Amino acid sequence: MKSDKTPKINKFIRRLYKIVNDNSFSEIQWTTDGLRFYITDKTAFMLNGLKYLSKTTEYSAFVRLLYVYGFSKSKSLNAYEEEYYHKNFKRDGDNLLPCIQRTVETKTTLLQKNTNRTPNQLQDLLQYLNNQNFKLEGEIKSLKDRVDQQDCTINGLVQLLTRIFRTNDSNKDMLLPLNITEHGSPINNELRINYDKNQVARLMADTPNIDGRLENTNIELSNNKNFLFDSDDEDSIYKTNFF
């Protein structure tokens, strides 16, 4: 029995094909021969068209995803325009869209592909990496500032508790009498303060592990440098959730 199941088209490819065919998006169009599409205005595309393809407004992430699906960047006569090509992505060729799938690349094939890329493609990838590294560096600085602030707070608490413990060692039960004597005073006329040293341990245990988070962020920043050759997962590459 023949299966009636229709070929599956990736959401990103289907939506890309839709907006290229939509005349209301003047910033992304087919070429005259209909074999390629080009972006006439990157700024306008990021503001108007990109939100229909992605939850992010990062143009470099959009370009990277095109490469993942096998698109290549063609040389454009206009420096302000970018043109992309895929043998199965063409005008009036919606029946070919199921053939466009994510490429599965090993480290060796990814290395070979990056070696054969044009300078423009490599520049786009480097720009994306630089943007991600800049964001990570900002997060690291923010975490370091929080660590410094937390250290000051902890040092202040330690000094305060040290003074309290010294007083507590000389007089374990500190009484603050209210017009009473030490002996025989009613319980409702005295304030007894007992200090428990175990509270210090609980206080230190409740301190957030910022050092661990800082170390993880540094590891992420280091891994980002190996992005071109070591990453083949779409979500980890872009930190972008395309739908």
From Swiss-Prot:
Q: Which GO terms describe its molecular function?
A: DNA-binding transcription factor activity; sequence-specific DNA binding
Which lineage do the record's taxonomy fields give for this organism?
Eukaryota, Fungi, Fungi incertae sedis, Microsporidia, Nosematidae
Stored InterPro entries: HSF_DNA-bd (IPR000232), WH-like_DNA-bd_sf (IPR036388), WH_DNA-bd_sf (IPR036390)
Organism of provenance: Vairimorpha ceranae (strain BRL01)
SMART domains the record matches: HSF
Q: Which family does the entry's similarity section mention?
A: Belongs to the HSF family.
Q: What is this protein called?
A: Probable heat shock transcription factor
Q: Which UniProt keywords apply?
A: Activator, DNA-binding, Nucleus, Stress response, Transcription, Transcription regulation
Q: Where in the cell is it found?
A: Nucleus
Q: What is the protein's known function?
A: DNA-binding transcription factor that specifically binds heat shock promoter elements (HSE) and activates transcription.
Might you report a single GO cellular component term? nucleus
Predominant localisation class = nucleus
Give disulfide pairs as residue numbers: none
